[in-house]
């Protein structure tokens, strides 16, 4: 159907094409793809226009099955001429996927260039005919149109995720761009501020230099007025006067959009610097840089060529430098200090303090003032370093070293000098000296004078001494009315006990000792803790070796003795025999015409215990024992141990003053604050007066038995004293170890004094009869060189006191049918004491015999091998002298001992170095054969000498 219009245009409708609506924002074009074997395919290409939206908006979803509108005649899209109508219709009716937002790149509205794929025909525009029909090329019969497959849901999701990630990245990039712009703005502001500060400082520097130049000019004018000179010379000097140094042009700023102007180039409008004369003197107060200093022998040409300095009379060009980064106020003190930066022209200026010191020094030099010498009192210890001495004298260590160099001693500030040298140096420098010693820290601690008006009577301190098993602890148990023995393992005293009893309203302090070893240690440390010694002697056993030792210890300590004759209840008791035996050791009892009190007692039946206590009080009254309870406490350590629950526990005896909880005391090389005071009954007390034994808790370490203690003012003093004593103990230990090696003379003297070697033993058995048998057998093993010494023997198990006694005597412990308790085993393992157990007496005797044999020096046996006569002596290079010998008797072995005999006199004894026969090293040479011999480290051999060969063997000796 067709109609005609007035302008003769025909309106027509194509019956083969469906009327569709045009999708907005979509342009179509068809591309034909060629494949192998002549196959082709038409592909419809849609170009979508991107719709910009905000990030928070959701994409609009178009209808999937919307019909595609027909392309109008005026549309700019392109389609191939051979595209069939059916294909276009099918493509238009196909469902379209929902549009998704494209990336931020804007797509072109229509392709402006042809497709460049190979074998693809050039696209041509579609021309409309007057009748409205589109001109189409005839389609080949074997070609058919195909429609592209739609995207699956997973592909759509992947594409959507990619686009969302791209949007997120876009937002992040936009934020980063904003931050970068902000940072750049701040950096520009900072640089502008730095530039302003640099310009201000440069202006101040120029003003200062200008003022200095003006002042110098005025000074020169004044000097010229005072010293008249010829006019021509004055004019010449005025012409040659250099411009102020450092009057450089101002540093150019950083222009925007242009290249920065060099710092050394003068700006426009600024005054040019005056010419600088090369030979002009540098400005006072600011020396020339090193680059402008002329070296010896350097000419003007070298200056012009190398350093760029101006020739004489010619203005020097200012040096062009690279723009320098100016640091801000915060960065001024940061940066690396190098030689280049330090030697630049604009060097580091002096500080205000340095300028002030320089001005004061200049004024003093002008006025010729001398600084007064301040005399100080210098405290000089036993040793001091030069640096510390200089600090105490307020002198420079360099001056002290110079003085020592003049005296011929090359020393360093860290060298240590003695007190005499330090005193000479201090007096030479005009100071007074106060000599002190390290031991001065202990001054004022002990032996402080007591207040006689405050002296009161104190209880006596009594020590019970005597032989083992004579009843010392049983006697003390009977006096205390407490069963102490039953609480001890095996009935043997394990520790030193200190107790206090009351008799007739008066207190008596008793100290029980397990043997003489502990009392010896206390006496050796100077502990005069005992006022009265009770010598316990068994009436049935009389005087024994340890009884004699106890008598000697008491006499050495200057302690009065009271003899207690114990066990008088036994049938075999003979007290008179005891008194007679004591006469041999200069102990004269009253019944024998002496002054020593004696009391017959029985600890088991508690007989005459009151008489013994009365004798003690009588002796104490004769001694008139007094003490000052109001002064600081002093005393002695009776025993000390490390308790698992309470820490370091020390049993002490207060001798002077009163001890309170909270006091700070020093005991030997240990110190601490008293946390608690416990008496002998286990009760906590508030104070401990003179002659009162207490346990102290709170020490930092465990002191030694016999150490003296004293209360000090503060912890610093206590720590100083403890450190000094620890250092002194270390020095003594080192000296003891170095002296133990000693010289041969000391070793011979020690052998001469000690005499025979002793093998100390502590023997414990099940019954007394076994112990006596073992003791008798060991006594028979002794010789003139070695013998067994029984330190202690007794019936019962091995206790901790036995281990302590063995440790003090360096003895071994032997147990016969007995065992050690756990405390004794732990103590022995800790102290390294060996404990051996035996059940057969013969095994015990054999082991002791073998151990004692080890103390015997081995026997040296010498076996004669043979003689050789030297026939001729050869001097061989790199070997020395070699003796050509003939063996005349026996044989000669390599490595054997030899003696060189000349005129029947032995002149050398040594070993053979080589033994050869016909240039071959041999082990031995028999009699009648010739050989060559060389000695070790000896060459004085002559023809006719006789060489005697022998073998030495060391044979161990047995008892």
From Swiss-Prot:
GTP binds at residues 466-473, 512-516, 566-569. It comes from Brucella melitensis biotype 1 (strain ATCC 23456 / CCUG 17765 / NCTC 10094 / 16M). This is Translation initiation factor IF-2. Residues 27-37 have a biased composition (Polar residues). PROSITE patterns: G_TR_2, IF2. It comes from the Bacteria. SUPFAM superfamilies: Initiation factor IF2/eIF5b, domain 3, P-loop containing nucleoside triphosphate hydrolases, Translation proteins. Keywords: Cytoplasm, GTP-binding, Initiation factor, Nucleotide-binding, Protein biosynthesis. Residues 566-569 are annotated as: G4. PANTHER family: TR-TYPE G DOMAIN-CONTAINING PROTEIN, TRANSLATION INITIATION FACTOR IF-2-RELATED. Residues 1-374 are annotated as: Disordered. It holds the Pfam family EF-G_D2. Residues 602-604 are annotated as: G5. CDD domains: IF2_eIF5B, IF2_mtIF2_II, mtIF2_IVc. Residues 512-515 are annotated as: G3. Residues 457-626 form the tr-type G domain.
């Amino acid at each position: 159907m067709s109609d005609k219009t007035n302008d003769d245009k025909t309106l027509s409708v194509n019956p083969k094409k469906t009327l569709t609506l045009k999708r907005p924002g979509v342009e179509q074009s068809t591309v034909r793809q060629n494949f192998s074997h002549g196959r082709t395919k038409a592909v419809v290409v849609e170009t979508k226009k991107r719709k910009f939206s905000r990030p928070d908006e959701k994409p609009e979803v178009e209808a999937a099955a919307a019909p595609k509108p027909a392309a109008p005649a005026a549309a700019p899209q392109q389609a191939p001429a051979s595209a069939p109508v059916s294909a276009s219709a099918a493509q238009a009716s196909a469902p379209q996927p929902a549009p998704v937002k494209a990336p931020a790149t804007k797509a072109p509205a229509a392709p402006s260039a042809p497709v460049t794929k190979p074998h693809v025909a050039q696209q041509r525009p579609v021309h409309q005919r007057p009748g409205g029909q589109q001109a189409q090329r005839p389609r080949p019969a074997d070609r058919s149109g195909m429609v592209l497959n739609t995207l699956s849901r997973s592909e759509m999701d992947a594409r959507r995720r990619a686009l969302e990630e791209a949007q997120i990245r876009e937002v992040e990039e936009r934020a980063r761009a904003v931050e970068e712009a902000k940072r750049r703005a701040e950096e520009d502001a900072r640089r502008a501020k730095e530039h302003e500060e640099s310009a201000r400082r440069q202006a101040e520097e120029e003003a200062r230099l200008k003022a200095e130049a003006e002042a110098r000019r005025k000074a020169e004018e004044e000097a010229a007025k005072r010293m008249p000179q010829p006019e021509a010379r004055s004019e010449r000097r005025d012409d040659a006067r250099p411009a102020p140094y450092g009057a450089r042009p101002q540093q150019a700023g950083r222009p925007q959009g242009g290249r920065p102007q060099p710092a050394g180039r003068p700006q426009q409008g600024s005054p040019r610097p005056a010419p600088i004369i090369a030979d002009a003197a540098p400005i006072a107060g600011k020396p020339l840089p090193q680059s402008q200093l002329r070296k010896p022998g350097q000419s003007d040409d070298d200056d012009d060529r190398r350093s760029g300095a101006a020739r004489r009379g010619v203005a020097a060009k200012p040096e062009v430098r690279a723009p320098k980064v100016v640091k801000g106020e915060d960065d001024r003190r940061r940066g690396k200090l190098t030689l280049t930066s330090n030697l630049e022209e604009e060097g580091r200026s002096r500080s205000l303090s340095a300028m002030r010191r320089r001005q004061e020094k200049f004024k003093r030099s002008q006025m010729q003032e001398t600084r007064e010498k301040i005399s100080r009192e210098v405290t000089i210890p036993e040793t001091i370093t030069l640096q510390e001495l200089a600090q105490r004298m307020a002198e420079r260590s360099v001056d002290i070293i110079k003085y020592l160099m003049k005296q011929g001693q090359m020393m360093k500030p860290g060298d240590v000098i003695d007190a005499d040298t330090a005193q000479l140096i201090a007096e030479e420098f005009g100071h007074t000296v106060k000599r002190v010693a390290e031991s001065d820290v202990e001054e004022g601690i002990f032996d402080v004078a007591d207040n006689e008006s405050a002296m009161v009577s104190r209880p006596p301190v009594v020590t019970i001494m005597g032989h083992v098993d004579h009843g010392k602890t049983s006697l003390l148990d009977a006096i205390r009315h407490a069963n102490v023995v039953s609480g001890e393992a095996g009935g043997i005293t394990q520790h030193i006990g200190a107790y206090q009893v009351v008799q007739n309203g008066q207190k008596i302090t008793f100290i029980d000792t397990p043997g003489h070893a502990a009392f010896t240690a206390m006496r050796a440390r100077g502990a005069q803790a005992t006022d009265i010694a009770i010598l316990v002697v068994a009436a049935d056993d009389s005087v024994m070796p340890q009884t004699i030792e106890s008598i000697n210890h008491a006499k050495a300590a200057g302690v009065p003795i009271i003899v207690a004759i114990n066990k008088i209840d036994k049938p075999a008791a003979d007290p008179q025999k005891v008194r007679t035996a004591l006469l041999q050791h200069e102990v004269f009892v009253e019944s024998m015409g002496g002054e020593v009190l004696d009391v017959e007692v029985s600890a088991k039946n508690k007989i005459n215990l009151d008489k013994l206590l009365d004798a003690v009080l009588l002796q104490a009254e004769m001694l008139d024992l007094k003490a000052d309870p109001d002064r600081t406490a002093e005393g002695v350590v009776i025993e000390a141990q490390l308790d698992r629950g309470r820490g370091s526990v020390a049993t002490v005896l207060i001798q002077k003053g009163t001890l309170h909880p909270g006091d700070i005391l020093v005991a030997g090389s240990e110190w601490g604050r008293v946390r608690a005071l416990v008496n002998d009954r286990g009760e906590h007390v508030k104070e401990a007066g003179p002659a009162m034994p207490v346990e102290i808790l709170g020490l930092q370490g465990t002191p030694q038995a016999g150490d003296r203690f004293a209360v000090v003012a503060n912890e610093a003093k206590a720590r100083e004293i403890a450190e000094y004593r620890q250092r002194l103990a270390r020095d003594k230990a080192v000296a003891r170890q170095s002296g133990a090696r000693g010289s041969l003379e000391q070793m011979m003297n020690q052998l001469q004094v000690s005499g025979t070697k002793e093998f100390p033993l502590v023997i414990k058995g099940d019954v007394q009869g076994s112990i006596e048998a073992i003791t008798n057998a060991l006594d028979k093993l002794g010789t003139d060189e070695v013998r067994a010494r029984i330190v202690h023997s007794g019936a019962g198990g091995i206790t901790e006191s036995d281990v302590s006694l063995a440790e003090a005597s360096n003895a071994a412990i032997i147990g016969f049918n007995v065992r050690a308790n756990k405390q004794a085993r732990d103590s022995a393992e800790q102290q390294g004491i060996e404990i051996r157990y035996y059940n057969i007496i013969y095994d015990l005797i054999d082991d002791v015999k073998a151990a004692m044999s080890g103390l015997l020096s081995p026997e040296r046996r010498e076996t004669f091998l043979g003689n050789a006569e030297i026939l001729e002596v050869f001097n061989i290079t790199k070997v020395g002298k070699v003796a050509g010998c003939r063996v005349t008797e026996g044989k000669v072995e390599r490595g054997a001992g030899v003696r060189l005999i000349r005129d029947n006199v032995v002149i050398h004894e040594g070993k053979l170095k080589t033994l050869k026969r016909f240039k071959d090293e041999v082990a031995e040479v028999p009699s009648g054969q010739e050989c060559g011999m060389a000695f070790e480290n000896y060459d004085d051999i002559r023809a006719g000498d006789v060489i005697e060969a022998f073998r030495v063997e060391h044979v161990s000796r047995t008892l």
